[in-house]
From Swiss-Prot:
Pfam families in UniProt: Oxidored_nitro (PF00148), PCP_red (PF08369)
Lineage: Bacteria, Bacillati, Cyanobacteriota, Cyanophyceae, Oscillatoriophycideae
Source taxon at top rank: Bacteria
Necessary cofactors: [4Fe-4S] cluster
Record-listed [4Fe-4S] cluster binding positions: 36
Primary gene name: chlB
Reaction equations catalysed: chlorophyllide a + oxidized 2[4Fe-4S]-[ferredoxin] + 2 ADP + 2 phosphate = protochlorophyllide a + reduced 2[4Fe-4S]-[ferredoxin] + 2 ATP + 2 H2O
Entry keyword Plastid: no
GO MF assignments: 4 iron, 4 sulfur cluster binding; ATP binding; metal ion binding; oxidoreductase activity, acting on iron-sulfur proteins as donors; oxidoreductase activity, acting on the CH-CH group of donors, iron-sulfur protein as acceptor
Species, as recorded: Gloeothece citriformis (strain PCC 7424) (Cyanothece sp. (strain PCC 7424))
Keywords: 4Fe-4S, ATP-binding, Chlorophyll biosynthesis, Iron, Iron-sulfur, Metal-binding, Nucleotide-binding, Oxidoreductase, Photosynthesis
Name under which the protein is recorded: Light-independent protochlorophyllide reductase subunit B
Cofactor binding note of this UniProt entry: Binds 1 [4Fe-4S] cluster per heterodimer. The cluster is bound at the heterodimer interface by residues from both subunits.
Record's keyword annotation contains Lyase: no
Residues reported to bind substrate: 429-430
Function in brief: Component of the dark-operative protochlorophyllide reductase (DPOR) that uses Mg-ATP and reduced ferredoxin to reduce ring D of protochlorophyllide (Pchlide) to form chlorophyllide a (Chlide). This reaction is light-independent. The NB-protein (ChlN-ChlB) is the catalytic component of the complex.
Length: 508
Protein backbone atom coordinates (compact mmCIF):
# COMPACT_ATOMS: atom_id res chain seq x y z
CA UNK A 1 0.00 0.00 0.00
CA UNK A 2 1.35 3.47 -0.77
CA UNK A 3 0.22 6.99 0.00
CA UNK A 4 -0.74 8.62 -3.28
CA UNK A 5 -0.99 12.30 -4.08
CA UNK A 6 -2.74 11.36 -7.31
CA UNK A 7 -4.32 8.14 -8.57
CA UNK A 8 -5.28 7.55 -12.18
CA UNK A 9 -7.60 4.64 -11.42
CA UNK A 10 -9.24 4.66 -7.99
CA UNK A 11 -9.71 1.72 -5.62
CA UNK A 12 -11.99 -1.17 -6.56
CA UNK A 13 -15.08 -0.07 -4.61
CA UNK A 14 -15.27 3.14 -6.69
CA UNK A 15 -15.71 1.02 -9.83
CA UNK A 16 -18.48 -1.03 -8.23
CA UNK A 17 -20.25 2.14 -7.04
CA UNK A 18 -19.98 3.71 -10.50
CA UNK A 19 -21.81 0.74 -12.01
CA UNK A 20 -24.45 0.55 -9.27
CA UNK A 21 -25.21 4.28 -9.39
CA UNK A 22 -25.40 4.25 -13.20
CA UNK A 23 -28.42 1.92 -13.15
CA UNK A 24 -31.87 3.32 -12.38
CA UNK A 25 -33.39 2.34 -9.04
CA UNK A 26 -30.34 0.47 -7.77
CA UNK A 27 -28.94 1.34 -4.34
CA UNK A 28 -25.40 0.63 -3.15
CA UNK A 29 -24.36 0.09 0.45
CA UNK A 30 -20.70 0.56 1.16
CA UNK A 31 -19.32 -1.29 4.19
CA UNK A 32 -16.54 1.15 5.00
CA UNK A 33 -14.89 3.38 7.57
CA UNK A 34 -15.37 7.14 7.30
CA UNK A 35 -12.95 8.44 4.71
CA UNK A 36 -13.73 5.75 2.13
CA UNK A 37 -17.16 7.28 1.52
CA UNK A 38 -16.07 10.18 -0.72
CA UNK A 39 -17.82 8.74 -3.80
CA UNK A 40 -21.09 10.56 -3.04
CA UNK A 41 -19.38 13.93 -2.86
CA UNK A 42 -17.29 13.26 -5.96
CA UNK A 43 -20.22 12.17 -8.10
CA UNK A 44 -22.55 14.91 -6.85
CA UNK A 45 -19.89 17.51 -7.67
CA UNK A 46 -18.86 16.24 -11.10
CA UNK A 47 -21.90 14.65 -12.76
CA UNK A 48 -24.44 17.24 -13.81
CA UNK A 49 -27.47 15.30 -12.59
CA UNK A 50 -30.48 16.30 -10.51
CA UNK A 51 -30.81 13.07 -8.54
CA UNK A 52 -28.93 12.26 -5.36
CA UNK A 53 -26.22 9.60 -5.59
CA UNK A 54 -27.87 6.33 -4.46
CA UNK A 55 -25.03 5.22 -2.19
CA UNK A 56 -25.14 4.76 1.60
CA UNK A 57 -22.15 4.14 3.85
CA UNK A 58 -22.58 1.51 6.54
CA UNK A 59 -19.83 2.94 8.72
CA UNK A 60 -17.27 0.67 10.33
CA UNK A 61 -16.70 2.30 13.75
CA UNK A 62 -15.43 1.12 17.14
CA UNK A 63 -18.79 -0.45 18.06
CA UNK A 64 -18.70 -2.51 14.89
CA UNK A 65 -15.12 -3.55 15.57
CA UNK A 66 -16.16 -4.66 19.06
CA UNK A 67 -19.40 -6.49 18.18
CA UNK A 68 -19.04 -7.45 14.51
CA UNK A 69 -20.77 -5.90 11.51
CA UNK A 70 -23.64 -8.27 10.75
CA UNK A 71 -26.37 -6.56 12.75
CA UNK A 72 -25.54 -3.09 11.43
CA UNK A 73 -25.09 -4.08 7.78
CA UNK A 74 -28.28 -6.19 7.69
CA UNK A 75 -30.26 -3.39 9.38
CA UNK A 76 -28.96 -0.86 6.85
CA UNK A 77 -29.87 -3.07 3.89
CA UNK A 78 -33.40 -3.76 5.17
CA UNK A 79 -33.96 -0.10 6.09
CA UNK A 80 -32.88 1.14 2.65
CA UNK A 81 -35.05 -1.52 1.01
CA UNK A 82 -38.09 -0.16 2.88
CA UNK A 83 -37.26 3.54 2.37
CA UNK A 84 -36.19 3.56 -1.29
CA UNK A 85 -37.81 0.34 -2.60
CA UNK A 86 -34.93 -0.27 -5.04
CA UNK A 87 -34.94 -3.18 -7.51
CA UNK A 88 -31.46 -4.15 -6.35
CA UNK A 89 -29.18 -3.37 -3.41
CA UNK A 90 -25.46 -3.97 -4.02
CA UNK A 91 -23.26 -4.42 -0.95
CA UNK A 92 -19.57 -3.65 -1.38
CA UNK A 93 -16.73 -3.58 1.12
CA UNK A 94 -13.70 -1.34 0.55
CA UNK A 95 -10.06 -2.36 0.72
CA UNK A 96 -9.99 -1.10 4.34
CA UNK A 97 -13.04 -3.04 5.57
CA UNK A 98 -11.87 -6.15 3.68
CA UNK A 99 -9.15 -6.45 6.33
CA UNK A 100 -11.88 -7.56 8.79
CA UNK A 101 -12.33 -10.75 6.69
CA UNK A 102 -16.06 -10.94 7.42
CA UNK A 103 -18.48 -13.25 5.65
CA UNK A 104 -20.42 -10.57 3.79
CA UNK A 105 -22.21 -13.14 1.63
CA UNK A 106 -23.80 -14.42 4.83
CA UNK A 107 -24.98 -10.85 5.63
CA UNK A 108 -26.52 -10.60 2.15
CA UNK A 109 -28.31 -13.95 2.51
CA UNK A 110 -29.63 -12.85 5.91
CA UNK A 111 -30.84 -9.47 4.60
CA UNK A 112 -32.47 -11.09 1.55
CA UNK A 113 -34.94 -12.85 3.88
CA UNK A 114 -36.43 -9.50 4.97
CA UNK A 115 -35.84 -7.39 1.86
CA UNK A 116 -38.42 -7.17 -0.93
CA UNK A 117 -35.87 -6.24 -3.63
CA UNK A 118 -32.82 -8.23 -4.71
CA UNK A 119 -29.63 -8.06 -2.62
CA UNK A 120 -26.20 -8.85 -4.03
CA UNK A 121 -22.59 -8.81 -2.83
CA UNK A 122 -20.15 -7.32 -5.34
CA UNK A 123 -17.71 -10.13 -6.01
CA UNK A 124 -14.46 -8.19 -6.35
CA UNK A 125 -11.00 -8.73 -4.85
CA UNK A 126 -10.19 -5.30 -3.45
CA UNK A 127 -6.46 -5.93 -3.25
CA UNK A 128 -5.98 -7.29 -6.74
CA UNK A 129 -8.01 -4.98 -8.98
CA UNK A 130 -8.52 -1.27 -9.52
CA UNK A 131 -11.59 0.87 -10.25
CA UNK A 132 -11.83 -0.05 -13.96
CA UNK A 133 -11.42 -3.80 -13.50
CA UNK A 134 -13.94 -3.77 -10.64
CA UNK A 135 -16.46 -1.82 -12.75
CA UNK A 136 -16.09 -4.34 -15.58
CA UNK A 137 -16.55 -7.29 -13.20
CA UNK A 138 -19.52 -5.76 -11.34
CA UNK A 139 -21.37 -5.02 -14.59
CA UNK A 140 -20.86 -8.59 -15.75
CA UNK A 141 -22.00 -9.90 -12.34
CA UNK A 142 -25.25 -7.90 -12.41
CA UNK A 143 -25.99 -8.93 -16.03
CA UNK A 144 -25.31 -12.58 -15.18
CA UNK A 145 -27.45 -12.43 -12.00
CA UNK A 146 -30.54 -11.16 -13.83
CA UNK A 147 -30.18 -13.38 -16.89
CA UNK A 148 -29.77 -16.49 -14.73
CA UNK A 149 -32.73 -15.39 -12.60
CA UNK A 150 -34.83 -14.89 -15.76
CA UNK A 151 -33.74 -18.27 -17.10
CA UNK A 152 -34.75 -20.04 -13.86
CA UNK A 153 -38.17 -18.38 -13.92
CA UNK A 154 -38.59 -18.97 -17.65
CA UNK A 155 -38.94 -15.23 -18.29
CA UNK A 156 -36.22 -14.81 -20.92
CA UNK A 157 -37.74 -13.67 -24.24
CA UNK A 158 -36.94 -15.97 -27.14
CA UNK A 159 -35.72 -14.92 -30.57
CA UNK A 160 -34.17 -11.73 -31.85
CA UNK A 161 -35.79 -8.37 -32.59
CA UNK A 162 -37.43 -8.09 -36.00
CA UNK A 163 -35.10 -5.32 -37.21
CA UNK A 164 -31.32 -5.37 -36.67
CA UNK A 165 -30.58 -4.13 -33.13
CA UNK A 166 -27.68 -3.53 -30.77
CA UNK A 167 -26.91 -3.32 -27.06
CA UNK A 168 -24.45 -0.55 -26.18
CA UNK A 169 -22.44 -1.77 -23.18
CA UNK A 170 -20.18 0.28 -20.91
CA UNK A 171 -21.72 3.77 -20.60
CA UNK A 172 -21.16 4.72 -16.95
CA UNK A 173 -21.43 7.64 -14.57
CA UNK A 174 -18.16 9.61 -14.16
CA UNK A 175 -16.91 8.28 -17.50
CA UNK A 176 -15.11 10.54 -19.98
CA UNK A 177 -17.85 12.30 -22.04
CA UNK A 178 -19.94 9.09 -21.79
CA UNK A 179 -23.35 10.79 -22.02
CA UNK A 180 -22.33 12.69 -25.16
CA UNK A 181 -20.79 9.58 -26.71
CA UNK A 182 -23.98 7.64 -25.98
CA UNK A 183 -26.13 10.24 -27.76
CA UNK A 184 -23.75 10.22 -30.74
CA UNK A 185 -23.78 6.40 -30.95
CA UNK A 186 -27.59 6.38 -30.86
CA UNK A 187 -27.61 8.87 -33.76
CA UNK A 188 -25.11 6.75 -35.66
CA UNK A 189 -27.24 3.62 -35.14
CA UNK A 190 -30.35 5.48 -36.33
CA UNK A 191 -28.48 6.55 -39.49
CA UNK A 192 -27.42 2.94 -40.08
CA UNK A 193 -30.95 1.60 -39.56
CA UNK A 194 -29.98 -0.30 -36.40
CA UNK A 195 -32.34 -0.13 -33.41
CA UNK A 196 -30.83 0.37 -29.94
CA UNK A 197 -32.15 -2.50 -27.82
CA UNK A 198 -30.57 -1.58 -24.45
CA UNK A 199 -27.88 0.80 -23.18
CA UNK A 200 -26.21 -0.45 -19.99
CA UNK A 201 -25.57 0.50 -17.29
CA UNK A 202 -26.24 4.27 -17.61
CA UNK A 203 -29.97 4.94 -17.13
CA UNK A 204 -30.91 1.26 -17.51
CA UNK A 205 -33.30 -0.71 -15.32
CA UNK A 206 -32.12 -4.08 -14.03
CA UNK A 207 -35.60 -5.44 -14.83
CA UNK A 208 -34.83 -4.91 -18.54
CA UNK A 209 -31.57 -6.87 -18.50
CA UNK A 210 -33.48 -10.02 -19.48
CA UNK A 211 -34.04 -8.36 -22.89
CA UNK A 212 -30.30 -8.17 -23.67
CA UNK A 213 -30.21 -11.46 -25.66
CA UNK A 214 -32.82 -10.09 -28.12
CA UNK A 215 -30.25 -7.81 -29.79
CA UNK A 216 -28.39 -8.99 -32.90
CA UNK A 217 -25.01 -7.96 -31.48
CA UNK A 218 -23.32 -5.97 -28.70
CA UNK A 219 -21.15 -2.87 -29.07
CA UNK A 220 -18.45 -2.22 -26.45
CA UNK A 221 -17.04 1.25 -27.21
CA UNK A 222 -14.65 1.39 -24.23
CA UNK A 223 -12.19 -1.40 -23.55
CA UNK A 224 -12.11 -0.72 -19.80
CA UNK A 225 -15.79 -1.39 -18.99
CA UNK A 226 -18.12 -3.80 -20.77
CA UNK A 227 -15.87 -6.47 -22.26
CA UNK A 228 -16.54 -9.04 -19.52
CA UNK A 229 -20.31 -8.61 -19.90
CA UNK A 230 -20.02 -8.91 -23.70
CA UNK A 231 -17.91 -12.06 -23.41
CA UNK A 232 -20.42 -13.57 -20.98
CA UNK A 233 -23.28 -12.85 -23.43
CA UNK A 234 -21.26 -14.36 -26.29
CA UNK A 235 -20.51 -17.48 -24.26
CA UNK A 236 -24.03 -18.05 -22.90
CA UNK A 237 -26.22 -16.67 -25.70
CA UNK A 238 -23.91 -16.82 -28.76
CA UNK A 239 -24.15 -13.04 -29.19
CA UNK A 240 -21.31 -11.55 -31.25
CA UNK A 241 -19.79 -8.27 -30.11
CA UNK A 242 -17.84 -5.39 -31.66
CA UNK A 243 -15.05 -3.95 -29.50
CA UNK A 244 -13.64 -1.43 -31.99
CA UNK A 245 -13.77 2.10 -30.54
CA UNK A 246 -15.33 4.37 -33.22
CA UNK A 247 -12.95 7.26 -32.48
CA UNK A 248 -11.43 9.05 -35.46
CA UNK A 249 -12.42 8.73 -39.13
CA UNK A 250 -10.50 5.50 -39.82
CA UNK A 251 -11.63 3.59 -36.73
CA UNK A 252 -15.26 4.77 -37.04
CA UNK A 253 -15.34 3.36 -40.58
CA UNK A 254 -13.73 0.10 -39.40
CA UNK A 255 -16.30 -0.20 -36.59
CA UNK A 256 -19.23 0.39 -38.99
CA UNK A 257 -17.88 -2.20 -41.47
CA UNK A 258 -17.55 -4.75 -38.66
CA UNK A 259 -21.15 -4.10 -37.55
CA UNK A 260 -22.35 -4.51 -41.15
CA UNK A 261 -20.45 -7.79 -41.43
CA UNK A 262 -22.06 -9.18 -38.23
CA UNK A 263 -25.54 -8.18 -39.42
CA UNK A 264 -25.04 -9.78 -42.84
CA UNK A 265 -23.89 -13.02 -41.17
CA UNK A 266 -27.28 -13.11 -39.41
CA UNK A 267 -29.40 -12.70 -42.52
CA UNK A 268 -29.51 -8.93 -43.01
CA UNK A 269 -28.45 -7.36 -46.28
CA UNK A 270 -26.67 -4.08 -45.54
CA UNK A 271 -23.91 -2.16 -47.27
CA UNK A 272 -22.58 0.85 -45.40
CA UNK A 273 -19.80 1.90 -47.84
CA UNK A 274 -21.79 4.75 -49.36
CA UNK A 275 -22.73 6.02 -45.88
CA UNK A 276 -19.06 5.92 -44.78
CA UNK A 277 -17.95 7.85 -47.88
CA UNK A 278 -20.70 10.44 -47.49
CA UNK A 279 -19.87 10.99 -43.81
CA UNK A 280 -16.11 11.06 -44.34
CA UNK A 281 -16.11 13.40 -47.32
CA UNK A 282 -18.99 15.76 -46.58
CA UNK A 283 -20.41 15.48 -43.07
CA UNK A 284 -17.33 15.08 -40.89
CA UNK A 285 -15.04 18.08 -41.21
CA UNK A 286 -12.05 16.14 -39.87
CA UNK A 287 -10.93 14.53 -43.14
CA UNK A 288 -11.10 17.89 -44.92
CA UNK A 289 -9.38 19.64 -42.01
CA UNK A 290 -6.49 17.17 -42.03
CA UNK A 291 -5.72 18.21 -45.63
CA UNK A 292 -6.07 21.95 -44.97
CA UNK A 293 -3.21 24.41 -44.55
CA UNK A 294 -4.11 24.76 -40.85
CA UNK A 295 -3.41 21.11 -40.20
CA UNK A 296 -0.31 21.10 -42.39
CA UNK A 297 1.12 23.70 -40.00
CA UNK A 298 0.98 20.97 -37.33
CA UNK A 299 2.79 18.32 -39.41
CA UNK A 300 5.82 17.01 -37.58
CA UNK A 301 4.98 18.82 -34.33
CA UNK A 302 5.83 16.76 -31.25
CA UNK A 303 3.09 15.46 -28.95
CA UNK A 304 2.82 13.25 -25.86
CA UNK A 305 -0.32 11.13 -25.31
CA UNK A 306 -1.31 9.55 -21.97
CA UNK A 307 -4.60 8.16 -20.67
CA UNK A 308 -6.64 4.99 -20.31
CA UNK A 309 -6.15 2.29 -22.96
CA UNK A 310 -9.16 3.21 -25.10
CA UNK A 311 -8.57 6.93 -25.44
CA UNK A 312 -4.76 6.96 -25.43
CA UNK A 313 -4.52 4.30 -28.15
CA UNK A 314 -7.22 5.94 -30.29
CA UNK A 315 -5.71 9.42 -29.89
CA UNK A 316 -2.21 8.20 -30.77
CA UNK A 317 -3.51 6.68 -34.00
CA UNK A 318 -5.54 9.78 -34.89
CA UNK A 319 -2.60 12.15 -34.36
CA UNK A 320 -0.07 10.02 -36.23
CA UNK A 321 -2.25 8.57 -38.99
CA UNK A 322 -4.85 11.25 -39.68
CA UNK A 323 -3.01 14.48 -38.82
CA UNK A 324 0.68 13.80 -39.40
CA UNK A 325 1.66 14.81 -35.87
CA UNK A 326 4.78 13.20 -34.40
CA UNK A 327 3.77 11.26 -31.27
CA UNK A 328 7.03 10.97 -29.33
CA UNK A 329 5.51 9.12 -26.37
CA UNK A 330 2.24 7.23 -25.92
CA UNK A 331 1.36 5.90 -22.49
CA UNK A 332 -1.36 4.32 -20.40
CA UNK A 333 -2.03 3.78 -16.70
CA UNK A 334 -3.88 0.48 -17.38
CA UNK A 335 -0.94 -1.74 -16.44
CA UNK A 336 -3.16 -4.83 -16.28
CA UNK A 337 -3.84 -4.60 -20.04
CA UNK A 338 -0.45 -3.31 -21.22
CA UNK A 339 0.09 -5.92 -23.97
CA UNK A 340 -3.02 -4.81 -25.87
CA UNK A 341 -1.93 -1.16 -25.66
CA UNK A 342 1.58 -1.89 -26.94
CA UNK A 343 0.13 -3.85 -29.84
CA UNK A 344 -2.16 -0.94 -30.80
CA UNK A 345 0.33 1.94 -30.71
CA UNK A 346 3.65 0.29 -31.55
CA UNK A 347 3.70 1.58 -35.14
CA UNK A 348 2.56 5.11 -34.33
CA UNK A 349 4.95 6.42 -31.64
CA UNK A 350 8.63 6.44 -30.65
CA UNK A 351 8.29 5.48 -26.97
CA UNK A 352 5.67 3.60 -24.93
CA UNK A 353 5.23 4.27 -21.21
CA UNK A 354 3.10 2.02 -18.99
CA UNK A 355 2.92 3.60 -15.54
CA UNK A 356 0.63 4.65 -12.69
CA UNK A 357 3.20 7.12 -11.35
CA UNK A 358 2.27 10.67 -12.33
CA UNK A 359 5.82 11.84 -11.52
CA UNK A 360 7.30 9.50 -14.11
CA UNK A 361 4.98 10.88 -16.79
CA UNK A 362 5.71 14.47 -15.72
CA UNK A 363 9.47 13.86 -15.97
CA UNK A 364 9.05 12.29 -19.41
CA UNK A 365 7.07 15.33 -20.60
CA UNK A 366 9.71 17.72 -19.21
CA UNK A 367 12.45 15.72 -20.97
CA UNK A 368 10.67 15.54 -24.34
CA UNK A 369 9.39 19.16 -24.36
CA UNK A 370 6.50 18.44 -26.75
CA UNK A 371 4.48 21.17 -28.48
CA UNK A 372 1.31 19.74 -26.92
CA UNK A 373 0.17 17.09 -24.45
CA UNK A 374 -2.99 14.99 -24.71
CA UNK A 375 -3.74 13.38 -21.36
CA UNK A 376 -5.78 13.39 -18.18
CA UNK A 377 -6.41 16.14 -15.63
CA UNK A 378 -2.96 15.41 -14.14
CA UNK A 379 -1.17 16.04 -17.45
CA UNK A 380 -3.08 19.32 -17.67
CA UNK A 381 -1.50 20.32 -14.33
CA UNK A 382 1.94 19.30 -15.62
CA UNK A 383 1.36 21.28 -18.82
CA UNK A 384 0.40 24.36 -16.80
CA UNK A 385 3.64 24.16 -14.82
CA UNK A 386 5.74 23.70 -17.95
CA UNK A 387 3.71 26.14 -20.05
CA UNK A 388 2.89 23.38 -22.55
CA UNK A 389 -0.73 23.30 -23.78
CA UNK A 390 -2.73 20.18 -22.94
CA UNK A 391 -5.92 18.73 -24.40
CA UNK A 392 -7.77 16.44 -21.98
CA UNK A 393 -8.68 13.15 -23.70
CA UNK A 394 -9.23 10.65 -20.87
CA UNK A 395 -10.47 10.24 -17.29
CA UNK A 396 -9.72 11.03 -14.50
CA UNK A 397 -11.07 14.50 -15.20
CA UNK A 398 -12.36 17.53 -13.37
CA UNK A 399 -15.54 19.58 -13.71
CA UNK A 400 -14.57 21.40 -16.93
CA UNK A 401 -14.53 18.05 -18.72
CA UNK A 402 -18.15 17.35 -17.83
CA UNK A 403 -19.38 19.95 -20.35
CA UNK A 404 -22.99 21.05 -20.58
CA UNK A 405 -22.70 21.54 -24.34
CA UNK A 406 -22.61 18.58 -26.75
CA UNK A 407 -19.06 17.26 -27.02
CA UNK A 408 -18.84 13.59 -28.02
CA UNK A 409 -15.50 11.93 -28.82
CA UNK A 410 -17.00 8.96 -30.71
CA UNK A 411 -18.61 8.84 -34.15
CA UNK A 412 -18.38 11.46 -36.88
CA UNK A 413 -19.29 14.42 -34.68
CA UNK A 414 -16.57 13.16 -32.33
CA UNK A 415 -14.01 13.48 -35.14
CA UNK A 416 -14.89 17.19 -35.42
CA UNK A 417 -14.51 17.69 -31.67
CA UNK A 418 -11.12 15.95 -31.71
CA UNK A 419 -9.91 18.04 -34.67
CA UNK A 420 -10.87 21.21 -32.76
CA UNK A 421 -9.22 19.97 -29.57
CA UNK A 422 -5.99 19.10 -31.38
CA UNK A 423 -5.77 22.36 -33.31
CA UNK A 424 -6.61 24.53 -30.31
CA UNK A 425 -4.15 22.66 -28.09
CA UNK A 426 -1.10 23.70 -30.10
CA UNK A 427 0.09 27.21 -29.27
CA UNK A 428 -0.12 29.44 -32.30
CA UNK A 429 3.39 30.87 -32.17
CA UNK A 430 2.67 34.34 -33.55
CA UNK A 431 -0.06 34.97 -30.98
CA UNK A 432 2.38 34.95 -28.06
CA UNK A 433 4.93 36.90 -30.04
CA UNK A 434 2.50 39.65 -31.06
CA UNK A 435 1.18 39.97 -27.51
CA UNK A 436 4.69 40.56 -26.30
CA UNK A 437 5.49 43.10 -29.03
CA UNK A 438 2.30 45.12 -28.60
CA UNK A 439 1.47 44.31 -24.98
CA UNK A 440 2.96 47.48 -23.48
CA UNK A 441 5.07 47.34 -20.34
CA UNK A 442 3.26 44.54 -18.53
CA UNK A 443 4.67 41.66 -20.57
CA UNK A 444 5.13 38.57 -18.47
CA UNK A 445 8.46 37.91 -16.87
CA UNK A 446 10.42 34.78 -17.71
CA UNK A 447 8.96 31.70 -16.03
CA UNK A 448 11.05 28.80 -14.83
CA UNK A 449 9.97 25.64 -16.61
CA UNK A 450 10.99 22.85 -14.29
CA UNK A 451 8.73 20.15 -12.87
CA UNK A 452 10.61 19.52 -9.67
CA UNK A 453 11.98 22.86 -8.45
CA UNK A 454 12.70 26.48 -9.26
CA UNK A 455 15.97 27.46 -10.92
CA UNK A 456 19.00 27.57 -8.67
CA UNK A 457 20.96 29.68 -11.18
CA UNK A 458 21.28 33.43 -11.17
CA UNK A 459 20.74 35.36 -14.41
CA UNK A 460 22.49 38.73 -14.61
CA UNK A 461 20.69 41.79 -15.95
CA UNK A 462 22.11 41.69 -19.52
CA UNK A 463 21.32 37.97 -19.92
CA UNK A 464 17.80 38.49 -18.54
CA UNK A 465 17.20 41.33 -21.01
CA UNK A 466 18.48 39.21 -23.89
CA UNK A 467 16.24 36.31 -22.81
CA UNK A 468 13.21 38.62 -22.75
CA UNK A 469 13.87 39.42 -26.42
CA UNK A 470 13.41 35.75 -27.37
CA UNK A 471 9.87 35.06 -28.70
CA UNK A 472 7.61 33.62 -26.00
CA UNK A 473 6.90 30.32 -27.72
CA UNK A 474 10.59 29.25 -27.68
CA UNK A 475 11.80 31.23 -24.65
CA UNK A 476 11.23 28.37 -22.20
CA UNK A 477 13.31 26.05 -24.34
CA UNK A 478 16.16 28.57 -24.66
CA UNK A 479 16.11 29.12 -20.88
CA UNK A 480 16.20 25.40 -20.13
CA UNK A 481 19.01 24.70 -22.61
CA UNK A 482 21.09 27.58 -21.25
CA UNK A 483 20.62 26.46 -17.63
CA UNK A 484 21.44 22.87 -18.52
CA UNK A 485 24.64 24.04 -20.26
CA UNK A 486 25.58 26.23 -17.25
CA UNK A 487 25.09 23.36 -14.78
CA UNK A 488 27.18 20.97 -16.87
CA UNK A 489 30.03 23.54 -17.03
CA UNK A 490 29.69 24.52 -13.36
CA UNK A 491 28.66 28.18 -13.84
CA UNK A 492 26.67 29.69 -10.97
CA UNK A 493 25.72 32.87 -12.85
CA UNK A 494 24.42 33.13 -16.38
CA UNK A 495 25.89 35.98 -18.40
CA UNK A 496 25.57 36.94 -22.06
CA UNK A 497 28.74 34.95 -22.82
CA UNK A 498 27.27 31.82 -21.21
CA UNK A 499 24.06 32.30 -23.22
CA UNK A 500 25.95 32.55 -26.52
CA UNK A 501 28.16 29.58 -25.63
CA UNK A 502 25.05 27.50 -24.84
CA UNK A 503 23.53 28.55 -28.15
CA UNK A 504 26.68 27.39 -29.96
CA UNK A 505 26.67 24.10 -28.04
CA UNK A 506 23.14 23.11 -29.08
CA UNK A 507 23.76 24.35 -32.61
CA UNK A 508 20.73 26.67 -32.58
Amino acid sequence: MKLAYWMYAGPAHIGTLRIASSFKNVHAIMHAPLGDDYFNVMRSMLERERDFTPVTASVVDRNVLARGSQEKVVDNIVRKDQEETPDLIVLTPTCTSSILQEDLQNFVDRAQMDAKGDVMLADVNHYRVNELQAADRTLQQIVQYYLEKGRKKGELPTGKTEKPSVNIIGMTTLGFHNQHDCTELKRLMADLGIEVNEVIPEGASVQNLKNLPRAWFNLVPYREVGLMAARYLEQEFSMPYVDITPMGVVETARCIRKMGQLLNQQGANVDYEEFINQQTLYVSQAAWFSRSIDCQNLTGKKAVVFGDNTHAAAMTRILAREMGIHVVLAGTYCKYDADWFKEQVREYCDEILISEDHGEIADAIARIEPSAIFGTQMERHVGKRLDIPCGVIAAPIHIQNFPIGYKPFLGYEGTNQIADLVYNSFTLGMEDHLLEIFGGHDTKEVITKSVSADSDLNWNKEAQTELNKVPGFVRGKVKRNTEKFARERGFSEITLEVMYAAKEAVGA
